[in-house]
Amino acid sequence: MLDIQLLRKDLDGVAKRLADRGYTLDVAAFSALEAERRAIQTRTEELQARRNSLSKQIGAMKGRGEDTSAVMAEVGGIGDEMKASAVKLDEIQARLSELMLEMPNVPHESVPVGRDETENVEVRRWGAPRQFDFDVKDHVDVGTPLGLDFETGAKLSGARFTVLRGPIARLHRALAQFMLDTHTQQHGYSETYTPYIVNPDVLYGTGQLPKFAEDMFRVEKGGAENTVTQYLISTSEISLTNTVRDSIVDASALPIKLTAHSPCFRSEAGSYGRDTRGMIRQHQFDKVEMVQIVAPEASYAALDEMVGHAEAILQTLELPYRVVALCTGDMGFSAAKTFDLEVWLPAQNTYREISSCSNTESFQARRMQARFRNAQGKPELVHTLNGSGLAVGRTLVAVLENYQNADGSVTVPVALRPYMGGVERIAAPSSAA
């Protein structure tokens, strides 16, 4: 959530910056609510001053033995008006809060201005795409003989679900373990296991609610009455970041660096017809997430570091990729600045997103009331960052396509072989060596 003082000081400036990311701030509605709020507060202060004055007057009158009934009646009327004003003020504050919760983050000044993904800016590339001397297959055709089973996934759960069997299931698990080991042993993250089901206030904290409720899977507890609806996490960013909600951490504890491997659940509302083939866009997929909670002055250095951590996974797997700075119109709701990593998929002859690393600055922290005690001993909002390190399913897709062989087998990347019992190649039973 944005700092409301920012809007009070420079409403037109904030409106312009939000317009850059495709959000139209209702300036008239905000201004009207603010004017009403100020009028009520001014009137309340006047009433308070009048009541204080009358209270002193009553004391003096009693000392002189005078009748105070008329003055006391006026004091009672003032009290009634102040109570009514307090109720009205609460209503206005609630409406302001609704407006603020719907507002996305303000883009950092370094973010390129653009309407959509076509105006993102490439920052760098790593690795040269492999030149194949045979017809390249996509991950569906490569993976199906190896245990990639969409038919059973659809039978069990419907479209956009997958069953993995045998060697391909093992390769998927190896990828997740490799990512976790790299982040914990080389990058300084603490491995964390969190619930996959969370309460609504947790989703308000990281910005999924109220705006993106249709993208979430809701769950209800069976056999219980009057229970609050809960949600399956769409990313473990949600649970990891909220571990510091409603708390004040010591400055000495920063940065807090957390990582988790979890399934993620997304309804993919609005994605009808997109990426219907294969594992690119699923309702359930695994991801290794990175989260950092840092002091404000350290957050942009932390963003660069986090991008580097995601890059290290791709480099170690020897998968070609590029880093892209997202433009204002393509950034996520909570982000002030985002870099995407896009991996090369030879069957599509293009780069596809495999990681997104974002600095939300104090946007999520304000919603969560996550603070630290600064050098002056005063509570101050932390900055929160999140990044995929990486999406496991999409990394599996990239390995299948980039490491495929003419005979239908797939070479196991060197970095994954210790997690595969030394296996160097996976193949369908009929073509296994």
Swiss-Prot record:
Enzyme class (EC, first level): ligase
Gene name of the record: serS
Residue positions binding L-serine: 235-237, 289, 388
Quaternary state and interactors: Homodimer. The tRNA molecule binds across the dimer.
Principal place of residence: cytoplasm
Keywords: Aminoacyl-tRNA synthetase, ATP-binding, Cytoplasm, Ligase, Nucleotide-binding, Protein biosynthesis
Keyword Cytoplasm annotated: yes
EC number: 6.1.1.11
InterPro entries reported in the protein's UniProt record: aa-tRNA-synt_IIb, aa-tRNA-synth_II, aa-tRNA-synth_II/BPL/LPL, Ser-tRNA-ligase_type_1, Ser-tRNA-synth_1_N, SerRS_1_N_sf, SerRS_core, tRNA-bd_arm
GO BP terms, alphabetized: selenocysteine biosynthetic process; seryl-tRNA aminoacylation
Taxonomic lineage of the native organism: Bacteria, Pseudomonadati, Pseudomonadota, Betaproteobacteria, Burkholderiales
Organism: Burkholderia thailandensis (strain ATCC 700388 / DSM 13276 / CCUG 48851 / CIP 106301 / E264)
GO cellular component, one term: cytoplasm
Protein name per UniProt: Serine--tRNA ligase
Localization of this protein: Cytoplasm
